[in-house]
Structure formats: structure tokens, C-alpha cells
Design a protein with these regions (language model features):
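Positively charged
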Residues: 1-179, 183-197
Length: 197
């Protein structure tokens, strides 16, 4: 089986947005991507990861598919995820992602929705994984890596000067609300909870 070499970070092609392309070119690149993905054992791969400056990526979580010139048009529910990347071997990064996304691509007629669904036969954890994988690959096509999405707990501690460690705060996430000491609330803030001002 003819496969391509994976481009390893750092490399300019991984940090530069890819160019739009046509369906015929995309289909040829997708074949190479799927072959390479099968050999490397990943869940997704983008064209620039095999040296092609084209906006094409493949994903194989619940089923194999490719996306041509994709863009995310809507996102829902922020989450922190743990990701690896074939172009950044032996490295796992906690990333800021979304649990559910809506995507448009030139090779599909309708908007594609990735993420958990009610009454779905597929495990919701798998559907979230697929949504994260699609975000990961579209990031590649936009010249971004997992380092650009790295979750930084410090950004949730900006209020530290306003609150003493033992001061009581009220935090919320969705419909859940908690009241506790600030020092105990930090771990919740790192998971996306917000202080009720």
C-alpha cells in the first residue's frame, strides 16, 4: 500500500492556512490520506500533514469520510479534551474544544452536525470524540495545531486578586450552581465554571 510521509512539527506547512481546492483533486488526496491514516493508526489526517497545501481532511471515528474546504459555522458547549497528533508524536495536550459543532464543506450538500445526540445508537463519548477530531483536522487546515488550542488554567484565575482564598463565591455551569470557598472553587473554574459576579 502506497502511503505518504507524515510532516512533523515544527514545519511551516503545518502553521500556514491551506488553499481551497476542487473535488477531483480532493478525492485523490483523500485516498492518500486514508491509506496513510490506516498505516499510522490515527483517527484523522489533513492534507498539509502529508505535505499537500490543500484544504482537505479525513476522519475515521464512527465511519470514514473526507471534508473539502470545510468550515465550522456553529459551536456549542465548551469542554476540555486531551489530544495527541500524528505530526506531534509522543505528546498529549489538554485542549479547549466544543462538544458539538456544525460544519459546512464543499463536498456535502447539507450542514453536518458532530457531537452527542438524544436517542442516538452510538455512544455519546464516541460522538464527542468525533466532534473533537473534526475540530482538530479543520484547525490543521487553518494552520493551527493542538498547541494553539492548549488549555491554560491560568486564564481562569484572573479573578484571584478580587477574591481571598477563603472568601465565599458562587459559581455556575449550565443550570448547576455552587457556593464554596474560592480556594476550592479554582478546580471548578478550570473546568469551565464561571463566577457569578
Amino acid at each position: 500500500m502506497d502511503t505518504k510521509q507524515i510532516v512533523i512539527y515544527p514545519n511551516d506547512i503545518l502553521t500556514t492556512p491551506t488553499k481551497k481546492t476542487d473535488l477531483e483533486t480532493a478525492q485523490k488526496i483523500a485516498v492518500d490520506l486514508f491509506k496513510t491514516l490506516a498505516k499510522e493508526g490515527g483517527l484523522g489526517l489533513s492534507a498539509n500533514q502529508i505535505g499537500e497545501d490543500k484544504s482537505v481532511c479525513v476522519v475515521n471515528v464512527t465511519e470514514p469520510f473526507f471534508l473539502l474546504n470545510p468550515k465550522i459555522i456553529k459551536k456549542e458547549k465548551e469542554i476540555v479534551y486531551r489530544e495527541g497528533c500524528l505530526s506531534i508524536p509522543d505528546k498529549m495536550v489538554r485542549t479547549d474544544r466544543y462538544e458539538k459543532i456544525w460544519v459546512e464543506a464543499d463536498n456535502v450538500d447539507d450542514t453536518m452536525v458532530f457531537g452527542p445526540e438524544k436517542d442516538n445508537q452510538v455512544d455519546n463519548d464516541v460522538l464527542v470524540l468525533e466532534a473533537v477530531c473534526v475540530q482538530h483536522e479543520i484547525d490543521h487546515l487553518n494552520g493551527l495545531t493542538i498547541f494553539d488550542r492548549e488549555y491554560k488554567p491560568e486564564q481562569y484565575r484572573r479573578t484571584e486578586k478580587k477574591y481571598g482564598r477563603n472568601e465565599m463565591i458562587t459559581i455556575s455551569k449550565g443550570k448547576k450552581t455552587l457556593t464554596l470557598k474560592y480556594k476550592k472553587g479554582i478546580s471548578y473554574l478550570e473546568k469551565g465554571w464561571k463566577i457569578n459576579e
